[in-house]
């Protein structure tokens, strides 16, 4: 049963997450899939105007290094993920309408941005819910099969590293592309205070790859190249000129820019972890349960 807006306004964020997950599950079981795809694409100029006005109020500017190569036909826009407003600024400059793939909406459930996303077309999911991830994937596939387009952040979390252009990617975008024969448009974005720089890449055709592993690797390499081109254009600092406490400064700046419901801990949990990372963590986890003795003391020595 749908709760009234007033009732939802009194709910906590965890309660809202549980409520909306239950709604998504019910709609999926009832066979409800993305609707009014074409109508929402036609309404894109209205959304774009709203985003432009909002950006001007934030006193932000956007520079396009290379424009988007695809204006018609379905596509998956795979974007690097940085700070707040990256999605909005990319979408404003995209030049066409598409649905958004958004994980862990949290505050968006009771914020005007959530209503905006819903009107535009969005697929929400809780990233720690396996069933919700499956439903979001299937709804995305259906959207693409119906001719719609999708904007997604395959890193799965904001990039909080000091020197990685792109973190390891989830394979979902590649699997969607292969299953629906949809080209992927890689997008790199970087922020310099109030100025954003966006770099659109050429389309990657899934038919050119044998499997999603190869496609994901190529996608990440291409996204990293797009970010590197931005850094090169902006004349980033050389390593020798960086302050000795640069890492600390970066972490402090990063934590200031992420939304209040994101923390370095939650970002670490939601990003993609490679098999090597998982195996390493599994090896080290048992150390917390070991009782030091002369037979195992070597495991606790700092190297």
Task: Report each predicted region and the residues it spans.
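Non-catalytic C-terminal accessory region of glycerolipid acyltransferases
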Residues: 2-23, 134-303
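Short acidic-hydrophobic, aromatic-tinged amphipathic segments that line or gate anion-handling sites
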Residues: 62-64, 123-127, 206
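Soluble or luminal CAZymes and related metallo-dependent hydrolases
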Residues: 41-45, 132, 215
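Short hydrophobic helices that act as membrane-entry/anchoring signals
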Residues: 7, 11, 36, 40-58, ...
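Helix-to-loop junction immediately C-terminal to a conserved catalytic motif
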Residues: 47-81
């Amino acid at each position: 049963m749908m709760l009234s807006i007033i009732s939802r306004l009194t709910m906590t964020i965890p309660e809202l997450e549980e409520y909306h997950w239950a709604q998504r599950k019910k709609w999926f079981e009832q066979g409800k899939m993305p609707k009014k795809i074409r109508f929402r694409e036609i309404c894109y100029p209205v959304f774009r105007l709203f985003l432009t006005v909002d950006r001007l109020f934030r006193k932000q500017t956007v520079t396009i290094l290379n424009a988007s190569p695809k204006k018609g036909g379905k596509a998956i826009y795979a974007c690097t993920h940085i700070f707040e407003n990256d999605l909005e600024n990319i979408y404003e400059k995209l030049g066409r309408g598409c649905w958004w793939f958004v994980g862990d909406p949290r505050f968006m459930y009771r914020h005007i941005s959530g209503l905006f996303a819903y009107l535009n077309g969005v697929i929400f999911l809780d990233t720690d819910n396996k069933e919700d991830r499956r439903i979001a994937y299937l709804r995305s596939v259906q959207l693409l099969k119906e001719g719609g387009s999708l904007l997604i952040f395959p890193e799965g979390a904001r990039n909080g590293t000091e020197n990685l252009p792109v973190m390891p990617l989830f394979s979902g975008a590649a699997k969607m592309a292969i299953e629906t024969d949809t080209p992927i448009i890689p997008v790199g974005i970087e922020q310099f205070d109030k100025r954003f720089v966006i770099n659109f890449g050429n389309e990657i055709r899934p038919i050119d790859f044998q499997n999603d592993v190869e496609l994901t690797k190529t996608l990440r390499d291409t996204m990293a190249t797009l970010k590197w081109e931005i850094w090169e254009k902006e004349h980033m600092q050389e390593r020798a000129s960086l302050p000795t406490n640069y890492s600390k400064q970066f972490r402090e700046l990063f934590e200031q820019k992420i939304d209040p419901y994101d923390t370095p801990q939650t970002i670490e949990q939601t990003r993609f972890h490679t098999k090597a990372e998982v195996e390493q963590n599994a090896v080290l986890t048992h150390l917390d349960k070991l009782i030091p003795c002369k037979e195992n003391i070597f495991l606790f020595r700092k190297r």
